[in-house]
UniProtKB/Swiss-Prot annotation:
Organism: Homo sapiens
Annotated membrane topology: Multi-pass membrane protein
Cytoplasmic compartment residues: 29-50, 104-131, 206-239, 288-309
Functional summary from the UniProt entry: Receptor that may play a role in the perception of bitterness and is gustducin-linked. May play a role in sensing the chemical composition of the gastrointestinal content. The activity of this receptor may stimulate alpha gustducin, mediate PLC-beta-2 activation and lead to the gating of TRPM5.
Identification of the protein by name: Taste receptor type 2 member 8
GO biological process, one term: detection of chemical stimulus involved in sensory perception of bitter taste
Record's miscellaneous remark: Most taste cells may be activated by a limited number of bitter compounds; individual taste cells can discriminate among bitter stimuli.
Similarity section: Belongs to the G-protein coupled receptor T2R family.
Domain of life from the UniProt record: Eukaryota
Organism ancestry: Eukaryota, Metazoa, Chordata, Craniata, Vertebrata
Positions of transmembrane segments: 8-28, 51-71, 83-103, 132-152, 185-205, 240-260, 267-287
Amino acid sequence: MFSPADNIFIILITGEFILGILGNGYIALVNWIDWIKKKKISTVDYILTNLVIARICLISVMVVNGIVIVLNPDVYTKNKQQIVIFTFWTFANYLNMWITTCLNVFYFLKIASSSHPLFLWLKWKIDMVVHWILLGCFAISLLVSLIAAIVLSCDYRFHAIAKHKRNITEMFHVSKIPYFEPLTLFNLFAIVPFIVSLISFFLLVRSLWRHTKQIKLYATGSRDPSTEVHVRAIKTMTSFIFFFFLYYISSILMTFSYLMTKYKLAVEFGEIAAILYPLGHSLILIVLNNKLRQTFVRMLTCRKIACMI
């Protein structure tokens, strides 16, 4: 029998799952149709398509994890189940982080202006090597998830042996969360791509500041397209920073939840807040991307006309 909190959690997480799949699926579908029509795809659309596919995987893993927690709160005490869930989550999490970082770096290279040789070389090369970069993101994520599975498996074995030792009963009692240390460690590693995104964000803001100063010197009274592109990219990256911060805090909350008396409630709250990252940022991308937004508006218009007929 589910508690009222469990019922609310299931309703909320189901709603987030539906919105997440629809939002990310919409981005993938629009880019795929555009790819078929034009027989080619732009670099930004290619990165976005890979990103939303990775986010669909992440949302699915998180929702499955949330439902399993409700149905079987003791799942984290079972080695095999926890290793499988944690491995898939690590892979999807890192893949999302690295592809999002690629998107943020791409925005910076394509929109910002600089005469530095390294910047110009990267700006020239990014379109040519994007396939290899995304393949590298996949390889890194797969490697990290396999390492996570091995570390977690060894950690479980150690605690299983320690549990039967009389002299270290206290140590096992303190370490009642066998996956606590691996989770903390891999959460910390996720900061690396975030730092790269943060650097790209500040460099883009600096580029906008320099560009604005130049515009003021040669003001024409008309709207500057470059400034609008800068602002749109900064809004996208700002939303990513906000949602990732929320996601990271939620992940830490879930990691430490078993130290709390209401651990199940803490995990449920953390899951709901964490899913806002792959859901919310993708919705922001739709709003700020001209092609995605205009396609969505046309769909709504056609639907209204069809209803009137």
